[in-house]
């Protein structure tokens, strides 16, 4: 009971810190906005005050995108690590990032797509098709879905799709590469409220599915045979979990580009704080990953003002060394 209360207080503290980070995201940037003006802009927009327009039309949408995409990547990473029982698993193992990138570059190079909405549709389509292909390739006729087969299928498909993407980029006109790299770098600039519609619904459905599977994932952590003895339908659990990962990682990749590291490290930090229970790991992963991506976006705006560094690049630059320190300080078995 005491541990549950501590976890609940930890979630509450994390939510409060995330709210403060979101407020900082609205106020900070190439042109800082005073906190009082930021709060006024959230309550009622003054169309004659350009600071209100900066907060409401530019920073609020990208803050929401960072929160949604980060939470989705964190939960997707926790699901992947629970399913494969591999501490290095992350959403990219399903080929979702590679599938989304290939679909976007095909759309830009062959169909001259230019708007963020069009990128969004292509990325989500490519991510979904890649995830379905990996799930089908990971099936074993005798035992159903196999974690090792799934990881190998995802790694192989990712390499193949990345190669195709590279071929198209190298042979495309320079303007095609310029349009593609903005999305591929994981930049959140240019996000608008219009882009949050159906990706937000997909993330909501994925989160609901993931949280509903938490108890089954706890049973599977004991081994497939014990899980089956406890009444867990392994094939159905795998199917629903993979569907949740595809929805979460696909929508996040479509919104923010192929963000690496966030979905890998957030579940490890969540386990350090919450223990091995997936009912707590999943919400902690959502909060931590949302904070990591939002923090990377804020830092990218401050370090390179008046321009900015894409959040995906900042996450890679800071995340790699931080994860190495984390692994060296704590035994891998504890992670």
Which sequence ranges carry the predicted segments?
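Alpha-helical transmembrane segments in inner-membrane proteins
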Residues: 1-335
